[in-house]
Design a protein with these regions (language model features):
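Short alpha-helical elements
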Residues: 1-282
Length: 282
C-alpha cells in the first residue's frame, strides 16, 4: 500500500525529479564500465516518502530494490543540495499562480516535537521532562498554507524565532501594505513589536489575562497546519541528527501540505485528467 495517494505522489515526484542533477547510471571512472548501477531516484524517493509518513527507521522500510544505506546516502545528498527547500518554493509558486496566496493575514506559531536521538538542532524539551526535542516555527497565509519554516531546539522561545521565520518570506515578493501577523500571547513583548515595525507589518497579538478562546481570531489556521505537519511520523518523532536532514524532511512535508491544499482547491475550479472527484485523495 503506498504511503501517500498516487494523485499526491505523482505531481510531487515530477517537480522533484526536475530539480535533480543529471548523473550517469554507471560510474564513468570504473575501468571495466560494469560498476553496480545506481538505484533509480524514483525508487529511493518512494522509500523516503514512506519514511516521512510513517516515521520508521530506514532498516524497516528498506526493500530488495533499495537498501537502508542507499536511502541514507541519497537523503544526505539531497539535503545538502537543498532540494526540499526548492521543491517547497516551487509548490508555493504553483499554488500562488493557480489559487492565489492570501498574504494580507499571516499567522505564525511554534510547535514542539520529540527528537529521541538528539542531534545538532535538538534541545531539552520543557514539556517532555527535559528529553531531547525540536521546535518548529511556522508561518502560514490566511488559509493555512505553510509559507516558511524554521527548526531549532525545543528549549528555544517562540519570540526569537519569529524574525528568521518571517525573513523566509522574501522569495514571495513584497507583502501587501496592510499585511498583519496574528500571534499568540507568547509573542507579546517589546522585541516582537519592534521587529514587526521594522518589517512594516501590523501585529495582532493575544493579550495576557484574557480567556484564550475569545482571542483565537485568524490564528487558528497555523495551529491546524501544525497538526497537519504532525501527521508525518518523521516530524512527530524525528530521529535525524544532521541539521540538513532535519530541514529536508521539514520542507518535504510542507511541500506535501501545499500540494494537497492546491489539489483540493483546484478540484472545484479546474479540470484535468485524473482529477479527484471527492475531497479524499486517492
Amino acid at each position: 500500500m503506498p504511503a501517500v495517494p498516487g494523485s499526491l505522489f505523482e505531481p510531487i515526484w515530477h517537480q522533484f525529479a526536475a530539480l535533480l542533477p543529471e548523473r550517469p547510471e554507471v560510474a564513468p571512472g570504473h575501468p571495466l564500465g560494469c560498476h553496480r548501477r545506481r538505484v533509480p531516484d524514483r525508487v529511493v524517493f518512494a522509500h523516503v516518502v514512506a519514511a516521512l509518513v510513517h516515521g520508521s527507521g530506514y532498516e524497516r522500510i528498506a526493500s530488495a530494490d533499495c537498501s537502508d544505506r542507499t536511502i541514507r546516502r541519497r537523503v544526505r545528498e539531497w539535503a545538502e543540495a537543498g532540494l526540499a527547500e526548492a521543491l517547497h518554493a516551487l509548490t508555493l509558486k504553483q499554488y500562488d499562480r493557480m489559487i492565489g496566496l492570501e498574504l494580507a493575514d499571516l499567522a505564525a506559531d511554534g510547535c514542539i516535537t520529540k527528537a529521541p536521538c538528539g542531534g545538532a538542532k535538538a534541545g531539552r524539551s520543557p514539556v517532555d521532562r527535559g528529553k531531547q526535542g525540536l521546535k518548529r516555527s511556522t508561518v502560514t497565509d490566511a488559509s493555512g498554507v505553510p509559507l516558511h519554516l524554521v527548526s531549532a531546539g525545543a528549549n528555544r522561545h517562540d519570540a526569537p524565532l519569529l524574525g528568521p521565520t518571517l525573513d523566509g518570506l522574501g522569495h514571495l515578493g513584497p507583502l501587501p501594505p496592510d499585511a498583519a501577523v496574528h500571534l499568540d500571547r507568547a509573542y507579546g513583548g517589546a522585541p516582537t513589536g519592534a521587529l514587526l515595525s521594522d518589517l512594516g507589518l501590523a501585529g495582532v497579538i493575544a493579550r495576557k489575562g484574557l480567556p484564550a478562546p475569545l482571542q483565537v481570531g485568524q490564528r487558528w489556521v497555523v495551529e491546524r497546519t501544525q497538526a497537519w505537519m504532525n501527521g508525518f511520523g518523521k516530524l512527530r518523532r524525528c530521529t535525524e541528527k544532521r541539521s540538513a536532514a532535519v530541514d529536508f524532511y521539514l520542507f518535504l512535508a510542507a511541500a506535501f501540505v501545499v500540494t494537497r491544499c492546491l489539489i483540493r482547491e483546484a478540484r472545484t475550479r479546474y479540470r484535468w485528467p485524473g482529477r479527484p472527484t471527492t475531497r479524499r485523495l486517492k
